[in-house]
Amino acid sequence: MVKIGEINRTSTFAWSLDALPLLATGTVAGAVDINFTSSATLEIWEIFSPTKKNEPIFTASVEHKFYALAWSKPFENRPKGLIAGAFEDGTVEFWDADVLIKSKNLKKASVHKSTKHSGGAVKSLQFNPIQHHVLVTGGSNGQIFVWDTKTFGEPFSPGQAMTPMDEISCVAWNNSVSHILASTGNSGYTSIWDLKSKKEVLHLSYTGATGKANFSHVAWHPTKSTKLVTASDSESCPVILTWDLRNSNAPEKVMEGHKKGVLSLDWCKQDPELLISSGKDNATILWNPIEGKKLGEYPTTANWAFKTRFAPSAPDIFATASFDGKIIVQTIQDTSPPVSTKVSASHDDNEFWSELSVTETQQPVFEVKQAPIWLKNPVSVSFGFGSKLVVVGKDANGKSTLKVTKFLVKGHERAENLLKHLKSENYDAIVDYHLQGPAINEQDKSDWEVLKSLSKNGKQGLFDDEEDGSDTTEEKKNSANKEDADADATTKDKDIENGKDGKDDTANAANDGDGDDDFFAHLGNGSTRQTVETYSPSGDFDIYNSQTSKSDKKLTKLILKNKIDDAVDSCLEQDNLLEALVLALDSSAQVKEKVKNAYFSKHKESSLARVIYNATEKNVTDLVAHANVKNWKDIALGISAFATDSEEYSSKISELGDRILHHDKSARDEAITCYIAGGALDKIANLWLQELPQYEADLLKTDDKNISSPSEARLQALTSFVEKIETFKYYAKLGSVLSGPLVEPISKTILEFVNLISGAGEFELANKLLMLLPGDIAGVEKERISKATGKDTKPIVSEGSAARASVSSSKYSKIPRKSLTSANANANANANVNSNASSTGALPTPATNILPPLANHHIQGQTPSFVQPQPQTAFGQLPTPSTSSAYPTAPVAKSNPYAKPNPYTPNNIYKTSPVPQPSVAPQASFSGTAPPPPPAVQKANSKERMERLARNI
């Protein structure tokens, strides 16, 4: 309990229905004021204001005291509702609350005053919760009247009571049916009235073991029209009864807890499981009327607590009025600290008693802990991994239920179709989907067009020049074969050496233009090449004539002397390159190289000479590195013609793509074409990755109903990204695992997509995509999916670890185990120890420290070798490994440069180490014949051992 406010008035009260409600109070009739005054006032309090709660915002004197106050909900022309007061003289007066607060004028705010009740006081009144302008009043002589506050016409009576009542103590409207009301009085009965039939329809009474209940108050269930609760103010039977009118012979629950009569009840409108009561025992008690349990009791007052009410719009707050001159406003929850913490532990007795006298020592006592409905979770929901939705709630009987369902996110069809196409390897359907649908942007459309060309024509078809058309069918066939294997590339090299490049054939075909099928049938086999007649000298000639220069005479003489090398040098001196080239045809390779260099040096500014140089060298490094990238297709054709194998082709064509992109960022389509031809998946994917944000922005601009938020656009963009990668991998016949220096950001993006689709329950597709990633990157996600699917999980082994394990397994499978015994192993080990000890005079180190390492056994098929003795070290130190070892070492497996180091990975078990592996028995050499053991060392006495130790130190 937290006390919010305290009003020092002996007054009845009524809450407004504002979010932060106001409190109207009126001096209560039938009680003496604390100041022994007979005056009466009507006041309004802003109880939740930190500055105004101690003083009323409106106060006015009235002629008579009140028995009851009521505050209606707003209705027509009444923005803050009406305040109705029941006076002790039988008068009922109505005030406009809005005018009353603004004008502070009681007479101006009064809208009606009636003395319809004759012969006594009006004890109770209440506004209808459904028809807010309708009021019911009850008073002396059993009079009950229903008022229409819109017209203030003549009020009417609901009918004749079955049992006459002398006084009506409480009237209450049904919260669900507007024409039903209940009344109770001093006759001991509660009557149920139907205004439509204008009669009393039910009559309730109760007699318990201790006597008959004298009903003082009645309240309806907040939502169920057939249930209500009554209170008895009888000293002999102070009970609270819950009723179901469908069986009105006996109450459903009898709640006992008050020691004296109950004067007031209020059933919480927001929570049917909360009911508050107060009575003659000065107690205020909180109940659960559904279960008939007492929840707790609040601090008692000094006199009767004659009225208690929840704040209608703030049910966590309630007010209690008592005859001790106070109205206490407090919370139903107890959040106050214990009394012991409120009073300081002072050693001064006077200070202790002074603090104790002003401290609230009473605190509520709760027997049952129950959260109010506005703090309960009637239903809880949680998303689970794998597109699971867990819902916890209650069924119609109030029992807890647990439901696990699967929900589908927008765009799930794309993921399902992707899985279907991956299974069936129907990548053409993926390409057609993107080409036939609306283009997101030009870059995306261009990418899918290139992939379409790759699927139809292969890599070589990416560089076909429509204007040139110089490639022959045989050349395309050779290029396609070279993409598959190095053996095919070798065959193509032979064709190139034999002159089967097809260019002359195509030119010839263009000249002929006859369309003869026989021409195409023999295309590329040399049958259509132009022939040159064989030169045969004829006629007489002069070796020298009058015009022959000295240099020509010198050259002629050198040729006639068969000094061809000198003749070539002479030609080069005279800059006669043509003659030098002819002479070099039948000369040594050295001479040919000299003439070539002279030619290229002379014509180094010629583009044709540069191309000829690359062709004669059969090396396109210069072409790729320095040729103008504007002619990138011609460069690509040169790479295709002169690359020696598929690895060189991929490397050079990817390098060309790098140059294109570096030269002009806008030429990304040309660069991607080169990357696709070179199988540079990491570079292509990195470009696509950089363009993802723009692709997402373009997606949000489309009219796609599946894309209405950035997160949905992100999912679709990632789906397209993965589709491109999978399609390219399939058409380019690449390996299953991504590799390359740019694999880390690509892997992270694929992992993001895997996380999204696995969260949507697409575990099969997620597993397929995880196969793209290196084991060190995908390991955690694989284990997560395995656990979600209930499959047995196995330790994730990286490729490097797997390679080392394979080498180790192959070694041990080839060791001749029959030749190994523990006896000769120990003998060899001891022999090495004793030999070293004898030669140096040092004490022998333990045998276990010089055993050969696990990886240094002899492998079958290698040259046998003996174990070399380990170098001697100082006493107590482990020997260091020698730089040259006779033991074979396993190749170091490639590791992922982007993977985080794992200190627990056994990646050093094959390194030469003097420390033996704990799981292996003492080792010996398994290659050749073991050397004979040296003579045994005689035992030295203690004196000799001490001298030897001193020398070593």
Curated annotation (Swiss-Prot):
Biased composition annotated in UniProt, kind: Polar residues: 860-887
Biased composition (Acidic residues): 463-472
Keywords noted in UniProt: Cytoplasmic vesicle, Endoplasmic reticulum, ER-Golgi transport, Membrane, Protein transport, Repeat, Transport, WD repeat
InterPro entries named among the record's database cross-references: SEC31-like, WD40/YVTN_repeat-like_dom_sf, WD40_repeat_CS, WD40_repeat_dom_sf, WD40_rpt
One GO term of the biological process aspect: protein transport
Membrane topology category: Peripheral membrane protein
Region (Disordered): 459-530, 860-953
Compartments where found: Cytoplasmic vesicle, COPII-coated vesicle membrane; Endoplasmic reticulum membrane
Main location: membrane
Biased composition regions of type Basic and acidic residues, renumbered to the chain: 473-506, 941-953
Biological function: Component of the coat protein complex II (COPII) which promotes the formation of transport vesicles from the endoplasmic reticulum (ER). The coat has two main functions, the physical deformation of the endoplasmic reticulum membrane into vesicles and the selection of cargo molecules.
Record's subunit section: The COPII coat is composed of at least 5 proteins: the SEC23/24 complex, the SEC13/31 complex, and the protein SAR1. SEC13 and SEC31 make a 2:2 tetramer that forms the edge element of the COPII outer coat. The tetramer self-assembles in multiple copies to form the complete polyhedral cage. Interacts (via WD 8) with SEC13.
Protein family (similarity comment): Belongs to the WD repeat SEC31 family.
Protein name as annotated: Protein transport protein SEC31
Natural source organism: Lodderomyces elongisporus (strain ATCC 11503 / CBS 2605 / JCM 1781 / NBRC 1676 / NRRL YB-4239)
